[in-house]
Design a protein with these regions (language model features):
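Asparagine-centered strand-capping/turn motif at beta-strand->loop junctions
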Residues: 36, 40, 44-56
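Intrinsically disordered, low-complexity Pro/Gly/Ser/Thr-rich segments with frequent PxxP/GP/PP motifs
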Residues: 63-107
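Acidic (Asp/Glu-rich), glycine- and aromatic
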Residues: 31, 52-71
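Low-complexity, acidic Ser/Thr/Pro/Gly-rich terminal tails and inter-domain linkers that flank the onset
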Residues: 18-38
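A mature extracytoplasmic/lumenal domain signature
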Residues: 50, 58-62, 93-95, 153
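Terminal connector regions
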Residues: 94-149, 154
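Bacterial N-terminal signal peptides
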Residues: 4-12
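Acidic/charged, solvent-exposed loop-and-adjacent secondary-structure segments enriched in E/D, K/R, S/T
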Residues: 147-251
Length: 252
């Protein structure tokens, strides 16, 4: 009798853990509901109505479709869902193709081999800003230039790119030089980006290195704003000029 009581416990410990499911398999699994929403990032919501815990594991590089639009996941995803429970996870993603997406997204069997080196790089660089990572995907897949990328972000002339966009573009250019030094990307030959980056105090030093401009031995010239007064009585060029223009008490 004691053996019969212990038998369920022994069988439970002997049974191997359920294999993780990828998102496509999870969508077909009875008792599971998987909904993929969001954009960049994607939001994966899993509802487990079964009596068995479930693990969903998806490597980076999954391409999801929403109408004519496509997004690709930039990092691996793992979701552990207890029995009769729900869980939600977000995964960084980037658009492969512009367009008005339909929701929810659906995983596809499509692949993009050109992204393999970039995905490997991102796996070891967890601090990569989202904007930079998304631009890198567009550069690798479509060789997008700076102006086209700005249009995809809704920045149309005469609007100027934000400093954040300029820094992201220069950071992306640095990564591209590291991943594919033999290739010339459209981003690297964009004269407007070069001019904007050299004028940007945050991106200037890195831009000079990327564009092959010798760095001066002395510190870079200070910005004009640092030369102006910040409080009354500061000896700035404007204050000195104003003092020279004031009439003297002796009338001279």
């Amino acid at each position: 009798m004691r053996f019969l009581l212990l038998l369920p416990l022994l069988l439970a410990t002997a049974l191997p853990a359920a294999e993780p499911l990828n998102l496509s398999a999870a969508l077909r699994q009875p008792g599971l509901s998987v909904v993929i929403t969001g954009g960049t990032p994607l939001v994966v919501t899993v509802t487990n109505q079964s009596a068995t815990p479930v693990t969903i594991a998806q490597p980076a590089g999954l391409i999801c479709a929403g109408g004519d639009s496509r997004v690709v996941t930039l990092r691996a995803l793992e979701v552990n869902v207890a029995a009769h429970a729900a869980a939600e996870a977000t995964v960084p993603a980037a658009f492969l193709r512009d367009g008005e997406p339909t929701k929810p997204w659906l995983p596809t069997a499509e692949t993009e081999p050109r992204l393999a080196p970039l995905l490997g790089y991102l796996a070891s660089h967890n601090d990569m800003p989202r904007l930079t990572a998304q631009l890198l995907v567009r550069c690798v897949v479509t060789d997008i230039d700076f102006a086209a990328w700005q249009r995809s972000l809704g920045v149309e002339p005469p609007a100027e790119p934000t400093p954040e966009h300029i820094v992201a573009a220069i950071d992306a250019l640095g990564v591209l030089r590291e991943l594919a030094p033999e290739k010339t990307f459209a981003l690297a030959t964009d004269p407007r980006l070069k001019l904007l980056a050299l004028r940007n105090p945050v991106a200037r030093r890195k831009a000079m290195q990327l564009y092959g401009i010798d760095l001066p031995e002395a510190p870079l010239p200070p910005e004009l704003g640092t030369l102006l007064h910040t409080k009354p009585g500061d000896n700035c060029p404007i204050c000195r000029q104003r003092a020279l223009m004031q009439p003297r008490e002796d009338g001279l």
